[in-house]
Each structure stands twice: as C-alpha cells, then as structure tokens.
C-alpha cells in the first residue's frame, strides 16, 4: 500500500501539491516518503510517493532505474509476474517496464498482472506518463484538472475543500490505462490522453470495446482510444448469462431455513463438486493475501506475541465468516487473527407513558416498574445487530478451530467521536464521493479499520489496538451471488432473466461504488485492504457458472441468496451463520440510526462538507 501522486504543469513553473493532499498521502505510507521534481519537455512534473512496507525489503518510491524511468506503484502482484518470496514487486515491475521497447510491451505486461494496483510510470525515452488502475479499480486513483494553471494532478487520495463547489477531484475510471505525452502539449490548458482499454479476448467472438464513462470531465480534457488498436486483456471471463431450465424443486418443499436443509443440496454430486471447487479457488485467493507479508524482526515478535498480522472486517455474517474460516487454514496456528467488529452507540428506547386508568392494580404497577428498571440495567448501547451476530460467529470459529487465538475486537463509537473524526479525517477520504451511503459506510469502515476497541475475553474489558497491516473485506460476494435485497426485488418483478441482467451490471460498476472509497478509508490507517472475493480466479470461476447455480431466489431469505456460498459454509463446518440473511453494514452497525431517518442512501450528504 502506498500513497502516490503526480503533478504535471505544462510550463516550467512548478505548481506545488496541496498541503492537505500531501498530508493525507503520508497517512497511507508511513514507512518512507520522497518527492522528485523533473523538468521534461518544457513541463514541470512533481512525483511524490509514500510507502507502506508490505513485501520484500523496504523500497523507497518514486523508484528510478539507471536510465531515468520512474515508477510509483500502489499495488500487490499476486500472480502473472514471477516473484520470489523475498523480492519487492515494485523493483521487479520497474525492471520489466524498463525492458519494454514499445507501448505494446507495456500493455502486455500490465495485462498479465494479477492483484490490485494503481500506478504512475514515467517512461523517459518516450517522454510520457502512463497511469491507471486494475480491472476492478481495487486501488484508488483520482485526478484533478486546472486549466487556468495549465496543470493536472493524479493522487491516491484528495482533500475536500471548504467550499464544496470548488472541488474538481474525480476518480480515474478503471476502464483501461492512460498515456499522456509530455512532448505534445499546449499552453492553453488542454489535456489529451490516450486510452488503452480492458477488452476480453475470445477466439470465437469479435472483440468489442466497452464504453468508457468519463462523465463530468472539464471541456479541456479529451480521452481518446489509442489509434494503434492496442488493449489490455481482461483478466476475467464475461459472466455466463445463460438461462437454465433446471431448478432445485427437490428442495423447494424444505422452505424452512436450517443447516439440514442446506446439507440436502450437497447430496447432489454435481452440486457438491461445484461447492468444493468454489472453496478451493477462494481458499487460494485468501492464501495469496495472508502470506505475502514482511517479516517482523525477532525483538518485535517477542514484544508482540499476541498481535495479529491479519485482520478481518467482521460482522459474523456469511461473507466474513468464510473469510475467517479460510484464513485459519493459511495463518500459522500460533498466530492470532483479529476480528474487527464495529458498533455505533444506540439511544435507549423511551418507555411509553403509563395509562392512568382508575382501579389499576397497584401490584401490577410495581411489577412493571421493576421490569422497566431491570431492562434499563440490561441495556447495552453497543449491542447492535452486528455485535450480536459477531459474538455468535466468534463462538462458531472457536468450535471450528479451538486452538486459534481469535481476537474479537469490540469497536465502540459514540456520536461525539463520529462527528469529530468525520470532520477531521473521514470527509477528506470519502471525497469525491458524497452520498449518504458513502458517509455511512465510509465512517463505519474507518472506525473498524482503525482497530481500537476492547476484548471481553476475561471478566474485565481489555483495551486492544489491532496492529495488523492487512485487512480482509468481503466486498464482491453480494455483487456476484445476488446478495442484495435489490436482487430479490428484480427477481420478483422480472424473473431469472431480470436477475441475470442485474448481476451483469454489478461488477461493471463496483469500482465507482465501493472500491476506491474503501481503499482510501482503510489506507488512512497505514493498512492495506485486500478483497479475496474479487480475486481474478474467483471472479472467473463464478462468472463461468449460470446464475441459477449461484443463487435461487425462489427460496427463502437466508437460503436462496448467495446459495452457493452458504453451501460452502456448511461444507467448511460452519453453523447458523450460513443462514444469516444479508444485513447492510450501515444497518448492522447502527450508524444509520444516528442520522436523519428520512434520508435516502443516494442523497447528497451534508455532513461530509468540511467545516474545519
């Protein structure tokens, strides 16, 4: 994980990086920072990088080779490029890029990379800058244009201006990689970018370029598909949109939700094989993400015996439970695993006024008063739904792996702290997104990833701060396996055909809905978000299956949605968590209850406007 930035001024007069942006970048990369300014073809270019050490030896960035090529890399290579355990992927990638003699070589190399990434690469021989994000946009990259100063900026994270109308930051669309020629510029403040799009290559189908959406860009910006016809090969196959006539009628009579009902599906040999294949590909995705970690020195290990290297955003729901069960397979048995469970303080429900009817039994009045007092004593303002399911999930994991130390971290947030940190940090990280949903999820994830909470293993609460640099999240499961309530609504109104169309749109828009924001939020703590459900092999496997094999929304909630994943949970030995219906994080953590109940998720959120 790194914070990377590039400021291109089309004159030799350098435009400095905004101070707040520079500060936010340093939060992402606490281990090493460096700025380099170059004058290139009458342009002034600032390269700024801030490194979080995750792999191999600590490698400062921007990283230059002997010929002047320069790489700013915010990513993890999990496949497609040969790397030894002790090697740093930034060094290996720069070496490979430096050997490229053409645009075709660069595009071919980037097509091979598996894992999340965003990058900026200065190719000195061509006097050009390459930049972009991976196919899903799992790493944040923003851009901002200033035609008056004839400059533009690329950055992992921005800063919200006091006057929201002045903001010009946007997320770089992950529809491909971009090339900017520093020798082909004018002083009138126009910016022309060549696009090398992601395209799925198939021998039996014509290659079609997806439409790139660059909405809201200023008139001075032009993005044109490269004239050479070069493209990056999509790392995943298109979704199987076939409509299967097969149904699971043999299980429809078992309308009650129980683990035994789920086990009945596994009596089908083909279904059981499909579930095993999903477990295998998902387990490998988790393995890649929990084993590529920098080694701690001996002194640090001895002082932090109970500190985990891996943390999981954990609600006790099926997505996070499966990640925890699979992480248990690949983390050494003597290493703890942190389970990050966030709750926002609930207000105690007010008791309705007592009826003053004549002749009411005084004994009953006393009994009611005693019961009310007892209820108030029992009330815990942080016993939100995700806390309750989280504790139940913790018990399942202890039963599954009793020798593992599971650190269930109860992260409790008051409204006062929420208001304070939203203004100080979170509004800048969510930016340029600005909806009520972005606010709710951004705040919930920020506090969860910070990892400051308590562990209630003993009689007394123990303050605990998670130091895990890797944070696993369950993003991608709902989008691929029909986990959202809107999927059930679409199925109800439009049948399986409508559901197939809805899911086909989901992954295409996930980068603009979630991933860049969540990367900025988690990265602010000097930690790295990793998304096993969006591993290229996992997505390709699921895309290859008919939708009817992944979900059956004719079955009840808690069974039909994400059916294949629920069967995997049963196969892994999990219990009632396999039957939990989807509960959105903003509702499960109860952050949504703290705000205006009349707001819609898509409304612009006034709370994200900074007043500091």
UniProtKB/Swiss-Prot annotation:
Domain of life: Eukaryota
The Glutamine amidotransferase type-2 domain, residue ranges: 2-183
One BP term from GO: asparagine biosynthetic process
Claim: Amino-acid biosynthesis is one of the keywords in the record: yes
Keyword Disulfide bond: no
Residue ranges occupied by any Asparagine synthetase domain in the UniProt entry: 277-582
Active site location: 2 (nucleophile)
InterPro entries: Asn_synthase, Asn_synthetase_domain, GATase_2_dom, Ntn_hydrolases_N, Rossmann-like_a/b/a_fold
Entry keyword set: Amino-acid biosynthesis, Asparagine biosynthesis, Glutamine amidotransferase
Pfam family, one: Asn_synthase
Cross-referenced Gene3D superfamilies: Glutamine Phosphoribosylpyrophosphate, subunit 1, domain 1, HUPs
GO molecular function, one term: asparagine synthase (glutamine-hydrolyzing) activity
Protein name as annotated: Asparagine synthetase domain-containing protein 1
